[in-house]
Amino acid sequence: MSNNVVTELAPTGTLRAAINLANFLLVSSRADNGDPQGVAPDLAAAIADSLGVGVSYVPFERPGPLADAAVEGVWDIGLIAVEPARAEHIEFTEPYVEIEATYLVSGHSDIQTIAEVDQPGVRIAIAARSAYDLYLSRNLQHAELVRAEGIDGSFDLFVSEGLDVLAGLRPRLLADVAQIENCLLYTSPSPRDRG
């Protein structure tokens, strides 16, 4: 590894890796010392090892604050989803993993396909500033996004407000569908799983 690459990626001599703690698929637990554990921390440690430097984890409760901190110089690499809005201040590599996001639709809704979600009057619970929030903000034309803090917050909002749709990571929605009577978990283009 050239010294220029090491200096560019780890200017302090330690690779400071920003970790999004909200993504339970990439951060599964905490070590006894408090360090995050899972795919994202392991990847950061492997990158640091290949650079010949140590790793220091810079945890963030959600992806939005992690992205905001890009301009503050508190981390060297961040492990969050590629998103055009974030690319204004973050230079992304090719994705290292793909995680499907989809919809959980309330049983009281007449929605039968993903294409039917984007219509006037449809209210979608969503984790604020998640990659899928940013994507849907750019692409939906009629449905209303109702934001909550984090994945748990969006689930609670969906249930408490009786919203039509919950947008989220498919693996989490698979667990959520089991907790709510008469909901549909969608994949493109039609319903797939009923809870």
What are these regions (language model features)?
Residues 3-81, 86-88:
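Extracytoplasmic small-molecule ligand-binding "clamshell" domains
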Residues 14-21, 37, 115-132:
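Short loop->beta-strand "edge-of-pocket" segments that line small-molecule binding or catalytic clefts
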Residues 27-32, 44-54, 129-150, 178:
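Ligand-binding cleft/hinge of the Venus flytrap
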Residues 64, 81-89, 159-185:
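A ligand-binding cleft/hinge motif common to bilobed small-molecule-binding domains
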Residues 96, 105-123:
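Flexible hinge/capping segments at coil-to-helix
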